[in-house]
Amino acid sequence: MRLVLFAVSSPYAAEAVETAARLGWEIAACVRNVDGPPIPPEVADVVEADELDAKLLAIPFTVPLTTPGHRYAATADAQSRGFTRPAVLVDPTAVVAASATLGEGAYVNARAIVGAGVRAGLSCSANRGASIGHHTMLGDYVSVGPGAVTGGSCRIGTGAFLGVGAVLAPEVAVGANAVVGAGAVVVEDVPDGAVVVGNPARTLRQGRGHGGVGVPAVR
């Protein structure tokens, strides 16, 4: 299996490289679509986005970015340039229930757990050691940070971001483009665009998504 890394401007690209290595996949190229040094530059040839050829465009690709809005924009950029095969990248140390469904472009990092009946939309990301409870529904481009835990039957909206070690009580809903801060404990529903922190989580402010960049409701 060969894989293209598209948008290699984030250190998180190194995580995708490690997962690919554990799977025995070859990194065919690292595509740089914005100015700046590619990270990591030593893994494969660095190709500028304006210099892609048909052979590369035929290879499955992944977008190794943690911010949902940036991942959405880079995925749209990749597809506009002719990539058509978003890879589902699952680390061999992760556990994904047979009854779970992962959308195109998903990345499940090392030792993450995706529970029974989970439904994840397009290009969702479960970072190291995250645990997504049974029958949880994730909208498109959701990011679940390292060590974050959701109880069963949670609903997480498009573009939402759960920070490192965040905890969601069972059946909690997190709105689209909301941000749950690192270590927050969420026991009540979180509105769209809200930034919540603390234990119990409280609204700090209204925002437009992690990093100030949201994901539109595309479907």
PLM features per residue range, with description:
Residues 1-92, 201, 209-219:
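Terminal amphipathic alpha-helical/low-complexity segments used for targeting or macromolecular assembly
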Residues 88-197, 201-204:
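Structural signal for interior beta-strand "rungs" in well-ordered beta-sheet cores
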